[in-house]
């Protein structure tokens, strides 16, 4: 299920994402979005995508991008390419909202991942940085490990944490809860 031409708005981080082309629309080849980063947004955790390449074009405002240990400001008209496996983060330190065209190749399940995080934030299940509690974070990092990985958590440690939390995941039926986030999001259900 895709939600192209629909928007998701994260009430915690202020980020708004409009899905333009989804995995469904492109046979999995591409996910294209427009993302609004509000002014004075916080830097998210440094992360990487093991199998995906990202392209960003700043349409309005400016975007601060950290690649490795270097942070650089990109202004309107700038383009950014991030190869698979490159550790990065991006946010808006500017004085106005930033609007960015964002393409992800291949799409994989990025749409579901972003929708799940937004729904968790909008239902009060994250901290003020938009990060869910440790058990949910571990479950999602394992579920989406081909799409998104945090730079500070090695896969071996994540796998061990997943094993330790597994009884909790089963007791709370995380597999079912986090299986179809788009369906729950579109139905307006807040039960993630």
Show which residues each predicted segment covers:
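A short glycine-rich, His/Asp/Glu-containing loop-to-beta-strand
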Residues: 10-46, 52
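Basic/polar N-terminal segments that are highly enriched at the extreme N-terminus
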Residues: 1-6, 190-192
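Ligand-binding loop in jelly-roll beta-barrel domains
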Residues: 84-113
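Alpha-helical membrane-targeting segments
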Residues: 110, 118-192
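Glycine- and acidic-residue-biased ligand/ion/polar-headgroup-sensing regions
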Residues: 51-63
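Short acidic-glycine-tyrosine-enriched beta hairpin
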Residues: 9, 55, 68-87
């Amino acid at each position: 299920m895709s939600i192209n031409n629909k928007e998701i708005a994260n009430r915690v981080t202020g980020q708004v994402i409009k899905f333009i082309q989804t995995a469904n629309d492109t046979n999995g080849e591409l996910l294209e979005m427009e993302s609004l980063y509000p002014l004075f947004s916080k830097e998210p955790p440094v992360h990487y995508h093991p199998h995906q390449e990202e392209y960003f074009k700043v349409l309005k405002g400016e975007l601060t991008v950290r690649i490795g240990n270097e942070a650089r400001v990109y202004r309107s008209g700038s383009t950014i390419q991030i190869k698979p496996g490159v550790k990065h983060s991006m946010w808006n330190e500017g004085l106005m909202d930033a609007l960015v065209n964002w393409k992800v190749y291949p799409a994989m399940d990025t749409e579901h991942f972003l929708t799940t995080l937004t729904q968790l934030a909008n239902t009060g299940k994250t901290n003020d940085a938009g990060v869910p509690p440790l058990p949910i974070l571990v479950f999602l990092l394992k579920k989406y490990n081909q799409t998104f990985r945090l730079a500070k958590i090695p896969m071996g440690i994540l796998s061990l944490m997943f094993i330790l939390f597994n009884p909790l995941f089963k007791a709370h039926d995380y597999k079912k809860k986090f299986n179809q986030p788009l369906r729950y999001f579109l139905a307006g259900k807040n039960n993630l």
